[in-house]
Regions:
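Extracytoplasmic/secreted proteins, especially bacterial periplasmic and envelope-associated proteins
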Residues: 65, 69-72, 179, 183, ...
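Gly/Gly-Pro-rich "capping" loops immediately C-terminal to redox-active cysteine motifs
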Residues: 197-216
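Electrostatic cytochrome c docking/interface patches
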Residues: 162-187
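N-terminal signal peptide c-region/cleavage motif recognized by signal peptidases
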Residues: 18-20
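Bacterial N-terminal signal peptides that target proteins for export
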Residues: 1-10
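The canonical Cys-X-X-Cys-His
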Residues: 184-199
Length: 216
């Protein structure tokens, strides 16, 4: 009996792995222009195109995607706005809107995983970067960091800047704008808050708090 049960579990597991991906949805919370996009709708978007990304940050090789320019999806968003892309695993990328709206130089794209043609796993035993992945063409032109390539994206929200949401994180206001402390804070927002919180401040659920319960 135990042997039969084990065989049944193995067969069931194999069936699950062989099942095609199901369609997903992307929640854009943009105020008056909020919308929930389905995979099929995005794959039929009038601006969707086949895009080759050189040396993809997550896959470490050239990748080809069906993708829509982010600027085409961010209706009503202004360059001075602030956005947050939240992934299924709790990664929360803090993104200035201006680079996402670029139509020249570094350009941001939403890559869409087609359930009929799934992407490869990121590594052995892992998921792919889908269902939605923020990718860039010519990222060097805009000094785009790896944290600005969130994958497994579930939602993109317009939010107040980090400094307004978490004022306790702000450096001393008496410091000059070019002070190393302020420069470090800018890097912290861009590179660290995507995964971590600090003293409970931050939205990411991916990595541990950088100071609680232990100060480094």
């Amino acid at each position: 009996m135990d042997g039969d049960y084990l065989k049944a579990l193995i067969v069931f597991g194999a069936l699950l792995l062989s099942m095609p991906l199901s369609a997903a949805q992307l929640d854009l919370q943009l105020g008056a222009n909020s919308r929930i996009w389905q995979t099929e709708e995005l794959l039929k978007h009038p601006q969707v195109q086949t895009l080759t990304v050189k040396d993809d940050v997550s896959y470490k090789k050239d990748m080809t995607y069906r993708a829509v320019p982010m600027a085409a999806l961010l209706g009503g968003i202004k360059p001075e706005d602030h956005l947050q892309a939240v992934a299924l695993d709790g990664f929360a990328a803090e993104l200035a809107a201006a680079p996402l709206l670029n139509t020249q130089g570094s350009r941001a794209w939403l890559a869409i995983e087609d359930p009929a043609h799934p992407w490869p796993p990121l590594s052995a035993g892992k998921h792919s970067a889908g269902p939605f992945y923020l990718v860039w063409t010519d990222p060097q032109a805009g000094n785009i960091s790896p944290e600005q390539w969130p994958f497994e994206v579930a939602s993109i929200k317009r939010m107040a800047p980090v400094a307004e949401r978490f004022p306790a994180l702000l450096p001393d206001p008496a410091l000059k704008a070019d002070d190393p402390v302020n420069q470090g804070f800018a890097l912290f927002q861009k590179n660290c808050l995507a995964c971590h919180r600090l003293n409970g401040a931050g939205d990411a659920q991916f990595g541990p708090d950088l100071n609680i319960p232990y100060s480094p």
